[in-house]
Amino acid sequence: MHFSFVTLFPNIIEGYFSDSILKRAIDDGKISIDFYNPRDLTTDKHNRVDAPMIGGGAGMLMTPQPLMDTLSKIKEESPEAHIVFLSPVAKPFIQNDAKRLVKKEHIVFVSGRYEGIDERVIERHADELFSIGDFILTGGELASMVLCDAVARNVEGVLGNSVSLEVESFEASLLEAPSFTKPINYENNEVVSEFLKGNHSKITDLKRGLALCKTKFFRPDLYKKKV
């Protein structure tokens, strides 16, 4: 699977893929990444990629020409590319989106800067828009990395243990049950005894019960949908 990042600051993103699971996935050929900097295609004589908002408003917007030309270039090179814009006004990205997007061959993440992107770019090129929450970041790079990580870990072979994907939070519309490791007793706080008895059927039932309790406490919105 291939991921492209359209960003004015590729170094911010590049470092994230230089270690750990996603680096191994790249080395093993499970995923690949590349970068497109709109500044490379700007026709502005001063190499600018931003301008004041028409009609007034604080701050600057990314101008349409560099982004339009960059995205058109990507679509010419890769007609199947699925272009995703990151915006706080968009719908929240959820786990089901990650599982759906992993079926795409090529995803392009467009990272905004300044006060955002000229709306005409979004209207022409966006296949989807996503938000990672009701808050504002200084740029879209972090959000792009979040989405890429969430999608990439669903690519077959990226995680060493595929079972991990089946028992994670949100996979059954519930939060994941509490997990424990050694020591069994730590500072007079013991692991639930049922986990130690080896009865896998009872452990499964216990985990589901704990997952329901955890979801009800931390995410009552999910709990209401489940029950």
From Swiss-Prot:
Q: Does the keyword Cytoplasm apply?
A: yes
Gene Ontology terms describing biological process? tRNA N1-guanine methylation
State the reactions this protein catalyses. guanosine(37) in tRNA + S-adenosyl-L-methionine = N(1)-methylguanosine(37) in tRNA + S-adenosyl-L-homocysteine + H(+)
Q: Where in the cell is it found?
A: Cytoplasm
- Coiled-coil-forming residues are none
Q: Which UniProt keywords apply?
A: Cytoplasm, Methyltransferase, S-adenosyl-L-methionine, Transferase, tRNA processing
UniProt GO MF annotations: tRNA (guanine(37)-N1)-methyltransferase activity
Per its UniProt record, what SUPFAM superfamilies does this chain match?
alpha/beta knot
InterPro entries the UniProt entry points to: Alpha/beta_knot_MTases (IPR029028), tRNA_m1G_MeTrfase_C_sf (IPR023148), tRNA_m1G_MeTrfase_TrmD (IPR002649), tRNA_m1G_MTases_N (IPR029026), tRNA_MeTrfase_TRMD/TRM10 (IPR016009)
Reported EC number(s) for this entry are 2.1.1.228
Q: Which residues bind S-adenosyl-L-methionine?
A: G112, I132, G133, D134, F135, I136, L137
Give the HAMAP family listed for this entry: TrmD
- Tell me, in a sentence or two, what this protein's role is: Specifically methylates guanosine-37 in various tRNAs.
Q: What is this protein called?
A: tRNA (guanine-N(1)-)-methyltransferase
